[in-house]
């Protein structure tokens, strides 16, 4: 079971904040397709992932993780069709647009809005520890149709390098270290956030 401070391991951190009881709001959650934060780090760097691909991946991972917790959702594609005429720049700023629409037209009791701030794969075929994979994303849950902010969580993890070694010890440490991909890190974050969300019921 996860605490509200961090997930079960002490290296994959999730910070969560509850603003009001959220139990009834989890009856049917509409998941908004994630978007890239304006400070997104990924495609601007070697080893980076284009923001449209990163947001698509994280949206899918979070959706599947929430479903695995037994929480009913409004399918992402159904949500996207319902809001296809809403200007994206406006909608991500004003969650009220999502909450009202999802609550009144899709039967949602809440909406989950997410943004990806970093989605970067490791760089360097032989020494990825110098530039390890790193992922940051955050989610906010709003009550539908009223739009009240209920809960938020932020996941931030960069794989640390192995302990400093020298000579043959360095080679052995590199072989023992499993260099995570951004996809693997994001999966851990999605599962941790979904677990926290389920615990908050």
Where are these predicted regions, by residue range?
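Sec-dependent bacterial lipoprotein signal peptides
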Residues: 1-5
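A structural "domain/chain start" motif
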Residues: 7-84, 186, 190-201
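A short, structured loop/turn motif at beta-sheet edges
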Residues: 23-27, 103-110, 141-151
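Extracytoplasmic/periplasmic, Sec-exported soluble proteins
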Residues: 26, 46, 50-58, 91-94, ...
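Short, solvent-exposed, polar/charged sequence segments at loop or secondary-structure edges
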Residues: 73-122
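Hydrophobic core residues within well-ordered beta-strands of beta-rich domains
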Residues: 110, 133-135
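Outer-membrane beta-barrel translocator domains and adjoining extracellular loop/strand segments
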Residues: 125-130
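Short secondary-structure boundary motifs at beta->alpha junctions and helix caps
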Residues: 142-194
């Amino acid at each position: 079971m996860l605490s509200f401070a961090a997930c079960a391991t002490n290296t994959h951190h999730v910070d969560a904040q509850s603003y009001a009881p959220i139990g009834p709001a989890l009856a049917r959650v509409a998941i908004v397709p994630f978007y890239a934060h304006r400070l997104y780090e990924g495609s601007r760097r070697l080893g980076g992932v284009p923001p449209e691909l990163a947001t698509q991946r994280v949206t899918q991972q979070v959706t599947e993780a929430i479903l695995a917790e037994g929480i009913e959702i409004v399918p992402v594609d159904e949500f996207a069709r319902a809001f296809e005429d809403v200007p994206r720049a406006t909608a991500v700023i004003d969650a009220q647009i999502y909450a009202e629409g999802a609550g009144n037209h899709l039967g949602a009791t809440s909406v989950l809005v997410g943004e990806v701030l970093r989605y970067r794969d490791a760089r360097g075929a032989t020494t990825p520890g110098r530039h390890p994979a790193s992922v940051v994303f955050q989610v906010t849950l709003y009550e539908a149709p009223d739009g009240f902010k209920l809960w938020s969580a932020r996941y931030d993890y960069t794989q640390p390098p192995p302990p400093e070694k020298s000579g043959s010890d360095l080679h052995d440490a590199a072989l023992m270290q499993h260099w995570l991909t951004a996809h693997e890190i994001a999966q851990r974050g999605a599962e941790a956030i979904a677990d926290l969300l389920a615990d908050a019921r």
